[in-house]
Amino acid sequence: MLIVRSGDRILRELEWTFTYDFPNYQTESTRPDDFKEFWANTLDELKQVPLKPEMKLNQKWSTDTVDVFEVRLMGLGNKHFWGWYCRPKKKGPLPGHFICPPTGLYQPGGPARSENVCTFSIAIHGFDLHLSDVPPGPHPWKSYHTLGLESPDTASWRWIYASLVRGMDFLSDQPEVDSNRIAVSGSSQGGGLALVLAGLDHRMHAVFPQYPGLPRLDWTVKHNTGYWPFKMSAKPKGQTEQQFLKTLSYFDAANFTADVQCPAVILVGLLDWVTASGNLVNAAAHLKPGQVQMICDPWGGHGSASMTYRNRYRQSLNQFLQHNRSPIIKPSK
């Protein structure tokens, strides 16, 4: 604990978790007793919903080497969601890359075209890729982060996480995709979503989060470790703090990492004050020895790691996608 004083008067008290021996870092878990049952039931419910993929070629974004499609899929509760699918024209099988979006309605932005990799960029807000169906004025899904937090069953994140698995259903079903070489990545919110998907679905073979949000949601509420995505102001009326934190525990990315089976390469800015780096370190501690490499920029913030560290991250990603080799160059434990 750091205490700042002016004479006898205490100006500020700060307390934080400091990890100095990551390979031996033992951390607690907020995972509820029925966590695995909750998600097994959710995914069983998803299996009852037909995939119903609709693919529309987008001429504007397509090139001589890549066909770009707008994809609409059916998610939990028969609610649709969209994504960009980029299919190279070269003969497969080709590696697959599932890309999770940063926060906000304006993500995922444009498609991620590649001449050598099939990419699927998912939109998780439930609106189409051009936002042409976003109504004027207030709408519940415009504030999807806090929608339905009254209970785990009604939380928007239940639908969102199930949609990730449904997106993987689509990507892994494409005949040109090498089912033995699928990666999932994302930055900020997308980094947290990538960890969640890797925990829920074992069809990917490597996960590459950057500056991930969504680990240790309880800390963001109680201790202000990063300001995204929740504060106590998101607590539904009439709930206690304990009830609110119990709901969040079903969607905390740190509670999924123990189930991740593939290698993980994580880009971290240690001075990240948006999605605090300590939250991610806590989540990564649940990964097994030899399974994780953290690329840590000591002076990097949120999305602002130096080119040196970004290049190390890209090297690992390309090593897996382009050369079908393990992405881990130097394990962190």
Residues covered by each model-derived region:
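Short beta-strand element of the alpha/beta-hydrolase
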Residues: 83-87, 92-103
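Hydrolase active-site cap/lid region
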Residues: 191-239
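Gly/Ser-rich "nucleophile elbow"/oxyanion-hole loop immediately N-terminal to the catalytic nucleophile
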Residues: 143-187
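Cap/lid segment of the alpha/beta-hydrolase catalytic domain
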Residues: 106-162, 219-226
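Acidic catalytic loop of the alpha/beta-hydrolase fold
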Residues: 270-275, 303
